[in-house]
Design a protein with these regions (language model features):
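C-terminal regulatory/oligomerization modules of transcriptional regulators
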Residues: 1-7, 125-145
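N-terminal leader segment of winged-helix/HTH proteins
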Residues: 1-33, 137
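Short alpha-helical elements of helix-turn-helix
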Residues: 9-13, 33-44, 66
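Short, locally clustered residues in the helix-turn-helix/winged-helix DNA-binding domain
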Residues: 16, 44-48, 109, 136
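Charged, amphipathic alpha-helical coiled-coil/dimerization segments
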Residues: 23, 73-136
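Central "turn" residue of the DNA-binding helix-turn-helix
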Residues: 34, 50-51, 62, 124
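Residues within helix-turn-helix
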Residues: 54-55, 66, 73, 93
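The alpha-helix within a helix-turn-helix
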Residues: 58
Length: 145
C-alpha cells in the first residue's frame, strides 16, 4: 500500500514548488539587469525604506549578517548603494540607494510586480484574497522567523 502524505505536507510541498518555479522566472528576468533575486530584494527594500540600517535590511531579507555584507559589497561596487556610519551609533551602518540605484529600482520593481501578478493571474481575484488571508493566518500562527 502506497503511503499517502498528510494534507499539510502536500500543501507545504506545493508552496515550495510554486516559490521555486516563480523564483526561477523572476531570477531569469533579473539576469537582464545583472541582478540576483537577493540583490533585487535589497534594491526593492531600500526603495520602500530609503535609509535603514544594514542589520534591519538583513532581518527583512532573512539573510545573515555575512551574506548581507557580501550583497552590499557587490551592489556598492556597481554604484547602486552606499553605506554610511550612523551618526547616532558609529557601530551601525545605514544603507541607501545611490541615484543610479534608485533609477534601476524604479525600473525593475514595477516589472517584478507585473511578473508576479502575471503568475498569480491564473487565480481569480477573490481566490487571491482568500489565499492571502490564509497565508497571513499561517504566518501569524507560526510566529517570528
Amino acid at each position: 500500500m502506497k503511503h499517502q502524505l498528510k494534507l499539510g505536507v502536500r500543501t507545504w510541498l506545493h508552496l515550495n514548488r510554486i516559490m521555486y518555479t516563480v523564483g526561477r522566472r523572476l531570477s531569469g528576468h533579473m539576469e537582464h539587469y545583472d541582478l540576483t533575486l537577493a540583490q533585487f530584494g535589497v534594491l526593492a527594500h531600500l526603495q520602500a525604506a530609503p535609509h535603514i540600517s544594514q542589520q534591519m535590511l538583513a532581518d527583512r531579507l532573512f539573510v545573515t549578517k555575512g551574506n548581507m555584507v557580501g550583497l552590499l559589497n557587490r551592489l556598492e561596487d556597481r554604484g547602486l548603494v552606499e553605506r554610511r556610519p550612523d551618526p547616532e551609533d558609529g557601530r551601525t551602518h545605514m544603507v541607501s540607494l545611490t541615484e543610479q540605484g534608485a533609477a534601476l529600482a524604479a525600473r525593475v520593481v514595477p516589472e517584478h510586480e507585473e511578473l508576479v501578478a502575471a503568475c498569480m493571474a491564473v487565480i481569480a481575484p477573490e481566490e487571491q484574497r482568500t489565499l492571502h488571508q490564509l497565508l497571513h493566518t499561517l504566518d501569524r500562527a507560526l510566529g517570528p522567523t
